[in-house]
């Protein structure tokens, strides 16, 4: 039991320790901002969207790109081929969330964008690219063109 009262909330604290992480949070009971300084999971969701990772897997038949885009509609995603050999995957999300209580009213607006470009190899058939979205996972398949092996002609050596 400490003889020094805790001025920093109901948790036990050591006010004399300069390295103590138990500090007073003026926003602890305020509904708009959490103790970490961010405003709910709403903004974190958009930040995760903006940092979207895309996996590129090469199979014997095709190059397959997979992007995890939870909560995104296929209308919010673009898949394009630029300059014949650059695959571009992009998306944008704008979201609004409103909460009302008898003490406060909160409206949050959030938006996020992502853009990824991949230079495709020479064996990519950009005329046959297919894309599909299922359960928040975008799959882009770029088939491979069968590369013709150079014809080798034997030359008879005389002499």
UniProtKB/Swiss-Prot annotation:
Signal peptide segment: none
Residue span, sHSP domain: 45-159
GO cellular component: cytoplasm
InterPro entries: A-crystallin/Hsp20_dom, HSP20-like_chaperone, Small_HSP
UniProt keyword terms in alphabetical order: Cytoplasm, Stress response
UniProt key word Cytoplasm: yes
Annotated localization: Cytoplasm
Subunit comment: Forms oligomeric structures.
Protein name: 18.0 kDa class I heat shock protein
Native source organism of the sequence: Daucus carota
């Amino acid at each position: 039991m400490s003889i020094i009262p805790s001025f920093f909330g109901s948790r036990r604290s050591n006010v004399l320790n300069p390295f103590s992480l138990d500090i007073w949070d003026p926003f602890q009971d305020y509904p708009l901002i959490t103790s970490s300084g961010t405003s709910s999971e709403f903004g974190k969701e958009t930040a995760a969207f903006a940092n979207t990772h895309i996996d590129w897997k090469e199979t014997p038949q095709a190059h397959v790109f997979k992007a995890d885009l939870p909560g995104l509609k296929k209308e919010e995603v673009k898949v394009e081929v630029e300059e014949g050999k650059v695959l571009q995957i992009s998306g944008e999300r704008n979201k609004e969330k409103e909460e009302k209580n008898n003490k406060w009213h909160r409206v949050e607006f959030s938006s996020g964008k992502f853009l990824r470009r991949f230079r495709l190899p020479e064996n990519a058939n950009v005329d046959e690219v297919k894309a599909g979205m299922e359960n928040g996972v975008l799959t882009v398949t770029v088939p491979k063109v069968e590369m013709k092996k150079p014809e080798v002609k034997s030359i008879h050596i005389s002499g």
